[in-house]
């Protein structure tokens, strides 16, 4: 199986393979044409929802049984993801505040920076973190200081997959590595890591997230009042702010979405009896868990208010004088970037431009990068061989069973 790692051009053949998701929301979620007329008559704020990363399927509709049936199917699906995320000692390691926690926070910071740099939708960033957590909880992936490049390779692969799932024009794997990453990998190495992530997650990449429910739940809790773009933006902000806090890994996406909707409606000036609102809305969620999730959000908001740093500081970065860590790239390729054709710079190489004063340091990093690049390639080759061996054993067992029958 190959990957299309170069930019699409008008001359590219239509049959070229890529991981770009060509399905629309209806084919993914099993919707039919009946939803077209409903979508066309929705409030203009739906356009705002879609621009923020909500798809039409995320607005599950109001009235009738279709929306409730979709909610039920999504809640069944999210249970499987909860099992994956809570498996093993992953949450325990994060709760202990060790290197796993610091690496996860650094990963989310970088993902958010790239999201802001390319103006990705919020769902793209959320999916990248979702893939990261599910992968780390599903395999024995040792986070150590000896191989920091391994962590960066995994993060890039998760974000690349999320961009291919959600963005209509996902950048190439090399272009994706902006905002001063410590290591930069070549396309082949990243694609190998993508395959490892895909197989580990059993190709279940259309994850259920709080964004899946928020439009429907907000409409229920807001009691039919107009859903404004301010409410939608506030929901998005709170959902993204929950990514770093590991306490929210213990809650289902539906519970997070309910707590977010309650918080946003209450912040709008309405006095809510949370228990009464949940009872009247008839949302199929655990009310006790929603209460605990809402309390965690209030505590998180209090910490952010008392912090001297601005909440937007995590998204601030300096791209005026970036330094390219040329790991995995050839020295001649690194040097050529500073004098490459103008069209290449306009197509995405500008963030990697190297100044003359940085040339010597970049060459030193290239030499060190080849050594680390060999380690990354060796890891991917070993993982590929292990996967092929596992698939082969499974095939032999199936043949034996078929022969016995």
From Swiss-Prot:
Q: Which UniProt keywords apply?
A: Cell cycle, Cell division, Cyclin
The protein's GO terms of the molecular function aspect are: cyclin-dependent protein serine/threonine kinase regulator activity
Instruction: Give any single GO term for biological process.
Output: cell division
- Chain positions covered by the region annotation Disordered: 377-405
Q: Which InterPro entries does its entry note?
A: Cyclin (IPR039361), Cyclin-like_dom (IPR013763), Cyclin-like_sf (IPR036915), Cyclin_C-dom (IPR004367), Cyclin_N (IPR006671), Cyclins_cyclin-box (IPR048258)
Keyword Methyltransferase in the entry? The reply is no
What are the Basic and acidic residues biased-composition ranges?
384-405
Quote the cellular component terms of the Gene Ontology held in the record.
cyclin-dependent protein kinase holoenzyme complex; cytoplasm; nucleus
User: Which Gene3D superfamilies does the protein's record reference?
Assistant: Cyclin-like
Q: Which residues form a coiled coil?
A: none
In terms of domain of life, where is this protein from? Answer: Eukaryota
Per the record's keyword annotation, is Iron-sulfur included, yes or no?
Answer: no
Record's family? Answer: Belongs to the cyclin family. Cyclin D subfamily.
**Protein name per the record:** Putative cyclin-D2-3
Q: Tell me the organism.
A: Oryza sativa subsp. japonica
């Amino acid at each position: 199986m190959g990957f299309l790692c170069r930019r699409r051009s008008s001359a590219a053949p239509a049959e070229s393979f890529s991981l770009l998701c060509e399905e629309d929301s209806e084919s993914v979620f099993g919707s039919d044409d009946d939803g077209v007329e409903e979508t066309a008559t929705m409030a203009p704020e739906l356009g705002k929802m879609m621009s923020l990363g909500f798809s039409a399927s995320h607005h599950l509709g109001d009235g009738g049984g279709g929306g409730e049936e979709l909610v039920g199917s999504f809640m069944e699906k999210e249970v499987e993801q909860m099992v994956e995320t809570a498996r093993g000692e992953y949450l325990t390691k994060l709760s202990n505040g060790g290197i796993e926690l610091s690496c996860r926070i650094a990963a989310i910071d970088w993902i958010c920076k790239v999201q802001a740099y390319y103006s990705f939708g919020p769902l793209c960033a959320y999916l990248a973190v979702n893939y990261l957590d599910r992968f780390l909880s599903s395999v024995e992936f040792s986070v150590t200081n000896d191989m920091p490049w391994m962590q960066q390779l995994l993060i890039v692969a998760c974000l690349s997959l999320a961009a291919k799932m959600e963005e209509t024009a996902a950048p190439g794997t090399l272009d994706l590595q902006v905002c001063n990453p410590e290591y930069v990998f070549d396309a082949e190495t990243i694609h190998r890591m993508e395959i490892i992530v895909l197989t580990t997650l059993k190709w279940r990449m259309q994850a259920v997230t709080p964004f899946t429910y928020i439009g429907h739940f907000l409409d229920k809790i807001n009691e039919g009042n107009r859903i404004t773009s301010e409410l939608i933006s506030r929901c998005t902000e709170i959902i993204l702010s929950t990514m770093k806090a590991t306490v929210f890994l213990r809650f289902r996406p539906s519970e997070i979405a309910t707590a977010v909707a309650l918080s946003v409606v209450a912040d709008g000036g309405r006095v809510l009896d949370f228990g009464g609102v949940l009872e009247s809305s008839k949302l199929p969620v655990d009310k006790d868990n929603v209460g605990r999730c809402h309390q965690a959000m209030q505590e998180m908001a209090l910490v952010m208010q008392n912090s001297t740093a601005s909440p937007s500081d995590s998204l601030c970065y300096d791209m005026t004088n970036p330094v390219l860590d040329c790991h995995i790239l050839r020295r001649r390729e690194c040097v050529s970037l500073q004098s490459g054709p103008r069209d290449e710079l306009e197509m995405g190489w500008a963030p990697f431009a190297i100044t003359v004063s940085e040339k010597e340091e970049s060459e030193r990093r290239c030499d060190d990068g080849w050594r680390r690049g060999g380690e990354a390639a060796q890891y991917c080759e070993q993982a590929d061989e292990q996967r092929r061996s596992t698939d082969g054993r499974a095939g032999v067992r199936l043949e034996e069973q078929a022969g016995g029958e």
